[in-house]
Amino acid sequence: LKVNASINTFVGGYLCPYNLGHDGVLFRDESKKGWASVANLADGLTNTMDLLDDETDYGAKFFNPANDDVQNFVLQLLADLAKYDLDGIILDRCRYDDYGLESDFSDISKQKFEEYIGETVANFPADIMAPGTDEIPSDQPVYFKKWLEFRAKVIHDFIVKAREKVKSVNNNIKFGVYVGAWYSTYYTSGVNWASPKYNTSAYYPKWATSDYKNYGYADHLDYIFLGAYASVNNIYGSGEWTMEGFCKNGRELLQGDVPFAGGPDIGNSTGWTDGGQSAKIPDAIDACISNSDGFFAFDLCHVKKYDYWNAFKTGFDKYLESIEE
């Protein structure tokens, strides 16, 4: 049995709905408020720790990935984690927060962006994105795509540091990440999980600069997990939002830099939420494992809740029989 530890990388707290409270360093330590993301909302720049209505603002509270203090804090957590007898460490949520394109517009991010481009942004944030922008604008501000490139660089450079930190403690521990397989829109999270050999701008010129590819981080990983979270009726097919298509795209995007496992969300994706899908499990396994280097499922609690054990055994047995033929 191999043991891999997953860490909620840039999450600093959680606000629960239904008056159930909150937890995390961002809530425990008021002095860390400056570590939280700042969102470029329609109402103006807003620290996400000022958004505390548990009916509308519940969910994870993210750190600003560009904050050096945040990065040092997380790197120390990884160093501590690497001291345990683990086979691997997987970074989850190593990205910008769920506000997507609206994050992060802190003074720190502004300063680092200006240092990166060697210019002063005279009209911030409007020269990057108008307040409340949550999708590609038809009329792009002057720094829009360069800002997306910068965000990808922030995450890329942290991945490099994180790998170095883990390996410095225990070089035998494998280092990897979990990401969503929907690459065509994953730029909203500030992540380029592809190989740097994949020329992103050739396929996505609306949002990728010619240098965006330089911040693909697949070549810094020992493995990667791709969430192929298609609906129960979109298991086979091509293109995104089919499980098979997600995994086939993943192979093209990763360019052989790193082995990868694709897998479904069997508890939250459309058609999976109420259980009763045992007959679909073997197909989901086949679609993913036949087009990647492995398989994972999100999440074990759903396997137990809906008693999918036999369905998984059937799927794995079919796969093992197919490779023995």
What are these regions (language model features)?
Residues 62-96, 156-158, 165, 213-216, ...:
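An active-site-proximal structural segment forming one wall of the substrate-binding cleft
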Residues 56-75, 141-156, 229-238, 266-272:
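The substrate-binding groove and active-site-proximal loops of carbohydrate-active enzymes
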Residues 99, 169-239, 273-274:
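Substrate-binding cleft/loops of secretory-pathway carbohydrate-active enzymes
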Residues 209-325:
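Substrate-binding cleft of secreted/luminal carbohydrate-active enzymes
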Residues 8-12, 93-96, 180-184, 229-231, ...:
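Active-site beta-loop-alpha junctions enriched in small/polar residues
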Residues 4-84, 136, 140-144:
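Active-site-adjacent "subsite" loops/lids of carbohydrate-active enzymes
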Residues 84-143, 182-188:
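Active-site-proximal loop/short-helix segments
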Residues 1-14, 77, 143-169:
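Aromatic-lined substrate-binding rim segments of carbohydrate-active enzymes
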